[in-house]
Amino acid sequence: MRFVIVTGLSGAGKTQAIRSLEDLGFFCVDNLPPTLIPKFAEACYQTEGKIKKIALVIDIRGGKFFDDLFESLKYLKEEGYKYEILFLDASDEVLIKRFKESRRKHPLSPDGRILNGISMERNRLREVKDRADNIINTSELATRELREAINEIYGEQDQIENQLVITVLSFGFKYGIPLDSDLVFDVRFLPNPYYIKELKQYSGKDKKVSDYVMSFDVTNKFVNRLEDMLDFLIPNYFKEGKRQLIISIGCTGGRHRSVAIANAIYEGLKSKGHEVNIDHRDINEDIHKGGKKL
């Protein structure tokens, strides 16, 4: 089990750090009183491997409970529980700027100067920082860069590469464009099986319909160009911090062309090792005569 304790200065980026760890599959708890760490650790270790990665945020908000941190860490060590400390730091100037921009009060100086609170906090956290396994100074890091730093330390390579979850979604324009779409492609320019008597009753999931749609040169050119564009977009979306991508492909009713094309794109992405799901939102709507969808 990997047990990470996240701490550091207020305003240094602990919230973003815990979100990044959560994206990496860590079970995360924010602001757990240090006195509860031993019992929490015991409970997690007793799950028999169901919980493999844990991250706790411990900070000055814990008040007097924070003083119990070292006793809890001593207990963990004596009981053989391995843990790591991640310390988030930043310069006084940057912290002051962040507090002013957020209009938040410093927890150790709610009615006084921000700098005084920062100084008090630095003194209280000095020993924790000295014990830290990893220290990240966020003074000059953008959110994306902090996420990358977290990934480099705590992420597994195959997990990082497949962290963007892709959903390929077919739909019918007559029922509305899916509201959560990131990319929308209109395939109503392709030959329509709906007007072929022996194909109308089937869907794009059926081989005879799929073969018909994919038999045209225009279809193959479109699929190839779309795949090339996705090969370019996906790593750049990931680089900018996107963790979910919804690719919506629409035709008139969402039963024939969009389904066949969505399946082709899904198979192509899957063959390249992406974590990808497929959903045909309106495949049965022409049968049920449903209304507008989200």
From Swiss-Prot:
UniProt keywords, alphabetically: ATP-binding, GTP-binding, Nucleotide-binding
InterPro entries: P-loop_NTPase, RapZ-like, RapZ-like_N, RapZ_C
Chain positions recorded as ATP binding sites: G8, L9, S10, G11, A12, G13, K14, T15
Entry binding sites for GTP: D59, I60, R61, G62
GO MF assignments: ATP binding; GTP binding
Pfam families the UniProt entry points to: PapZ_C, RapZ-like_N
Record's function text: Displays ATPase and GTPase activities.
Family: Belongs to the RapZ-like family.
HAMAP family registered for this protein in UniProt: RapZ_like
Protein name per its UniProtKB record: Nucleotide-binding protein CLK_2809
